[in-house]
Design a protein with these regions (language model features):
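Short, Lys/Arg-enriched N-terminal segments with co-localized hydrophobic residues
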Residues: 7-27
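Non-catalytic scaffold segments within catalytic domains of secreted glycoside hydrolases
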Residues: 27-100, 104-109, 118-507
Length: 507
């Protein structure tokens, strides 16, 4: 018996035998031929060499280590006998050739990374860039090019120059827009023939939460203390976010006008939420939280204007966004070409204050879903939520999507023979990739997939090394010790097979 197989546009591909158990491997791959398989990193968690070759201090360099139970701290001055894990991180700066060779061995088509702003402009305020910093990224992009790997570059990924925090209170000051544009123009010009895909800000919607005032906005001048105890100053955060919106739009318009070969995207945390029950109060609360957390910053980047639902939020929270003439026009002219997001977990929302069992999360949590398992850090594992999210995003925006962060933070055991058996990570990735492919069958236009921390990096939320995501193990520990050697985990070989088969072989 034969079955007709069609693509998403209804075009007949060919016939297959429905009784064949290997049917999946006989039909055309669900994913496009040029699908961007790869992995994701960020300079502030991976690069290290925090003061090498003229680099300045970023806000990440001023954050101490922490753990699941003890939050990391931000300190305005360096404290003796305190570990600042981002300063060495896992030392991509001195291992980039080795690491890119490992990525190539896995079959990467795409390498998501960020440029460290303070490596190019140490304080963010210089008129002339740091040539040593520019040369470093030349070497990185050339090495990627040698293997035919496409860089996907985040311009600002939680590494605002600390000097801008001290002078301007970070993005709260409009002055920082000009500093950012100088930085963008420099790297666009320098790498115009080496980089095609750009993201302006990492997880820009983190600025809607108090902790985002440190990580993303740098709007914490003079603050010293745990990152989870930052004052909830909404007026400051949303004004700072407006300045980031304007900066992002200006950078995108400048790129479109001067480098038409560039593809410009945005990047958001997507914290998928479900109503805890079918009680209308839960449904309305879930809708509100989805808007505040996920849709607001996404709508501005893709549609080019503030959504109407924010008016009530601003009014009820006494927030007045100071705009300059022309800001609204800038937002309209600087919309993105594609949309990227991180997806790790989902959570529930309940209007019932007696529902108290909470879930952990990547900066944002919620009520625990009784139908889901959780990671060692309390992040609920929801592969089908990724399919749901992709469908919701594509239905809303109708532009290409890319999953640029996804993965399982876990405790890995290094065996005596040097092996790392991480079947739990393989299982997590397998389930999410399978649901990603289901979304493509649903009609979603998906560009690529870069799981987070393909090589072990410092955790952004906790500042620890014990929370490992990588398919490559790095010998580095929470106390700062380790020889930084690299070892392949079982997941390395599994992902290599997945890429080679373009997602057909997930066994």
């Amino acid at each position: 018996m034969l079955e007709l197989v069609f693509d998403s546009k209804g075009t007949k591909l060919y016939n297959v035998c429905i009784n064949n158990k290997k049917r999946r491997k006989q039909i055309m791959s669900v994913l496009r031929e040029d699908f961007l398989w790869g992995g994701a990193t960020a300079a502030n968690q991976y690069e290290g060499a925090w003061d090498a070759d003229g680099k300045g201090a970023s806000i990440s360099d001023m954050c101490t280590n922490g753990s699941y139970t003890t939050p990391k701290r931000v300190t305005p001055i360096f404290e003796e006998n305190t570990l600042y894990p981002s300063r060495e991180a896992t030392d991509f700066y001195h291992h980039y050739k080795e690491d890119i060779a490992l990525a190539a061995e896995m079959g990467f088509k795409c390498f998501r990374m960020s440029i460290n702003w303070t490596r190019i402009y140490p304080t963010g305020m210089e008129e002339t860039p740091n040539e040593a910093g520019l040369a470093f990224y030349d070497h990185v992009f050339d090495e990627l090019g040698k293997y035919g790997i496409e860089p996907l570059v985040t311009i600002s990924h939680y590494e605002m120059p600390y000097a801008l925090v001290e002078k301007y209170n970070g993005w709260y000051s409009r002055e920082v827009i000009d500093c950012f544009m100088r930085y963008c123009k420099t790297i666009f010009s320098r790498y115009q023939d080496k980089v095609k895909y750009w993201l302006t800000f990492n997880e820009i919607n983190s600025g809607t939460m108090p902790m985002g005032a440190i990580l993303s906005l740098g709007a914490v001048k003079g603050y010293c203390g745990p990152v989870n105890e930052v004052p909830d100053e909404k007026q400051i955060r949303y004004q700072a976010l407006h300045h980031q919106f304007v900066a992002s739009a200006k950078a995108i318009k400048y790129a479109h006008d001067n480098y038409p070969q560039f593809q410009m995207g945005c990047m958001c945390i997507f914290a998928t939420k479900y109503p805890y029950t079918c009680n209308p109060d839960d449904v309305l609360l879930c809708q509100k939280e989805m808007r505040m957390m996920n849709w607001f910053t996404s709508d501005v980047h893709v549609r080019g204007y503030y959504p109407s639902y924010m008016n009530r939020f601003f009014e009820e929270n006494h927030i007045v966004i100071q705009k300059e003439p022309g800001d609204d026009e800038i937002l309209k002219e600087g919309i993105v070409d594609f949309y990227t997001f991180s997806y790790y977990m989902s959570s529930c929302e309940s209007a019932d204050s007696e529902v108290v069992e909470k879930s952990g999360g990547n900066l944002v949590g919620g009520v625990k879903n009784p139908y889901l398992k959780a990671s060692d850090w309390g992040w609920q594992i929801d592969p089908k939520g990724l399919r749901y999210t992709l469908n919701e995003l594509y239905d809303r925006y109708q532009i290409p999507l890319m999953v640029v962060e996804n993965g399982l933070g876990a405790y890995d055991k290094l065996e005596e023979d040097g092996s790392i058996h991480d079947s739990y990570r393989i299982d997590y990735l397998r389930q999410h990739i399978a649901q990603m492919e289901e979304a493509v069958k649903d009609g979603v236009d998906l560009m690529g997939y870069t799981p987070w921390g393909w090589i072990d990096v410092v955790s952004a939320s906790t500042g620890e090394m014990a929370k490992r995501y990588g398919m490559v193990y790095v010998d580095k520990y929470d106390d700062g010790t380790g020889d930084l050697s690299r070892k392949k985990k079982d997941s390395f070989y599994w992902y290599q097979k997945v890429i080679k088969s373009n997602g057909e072989d997930l066994d």
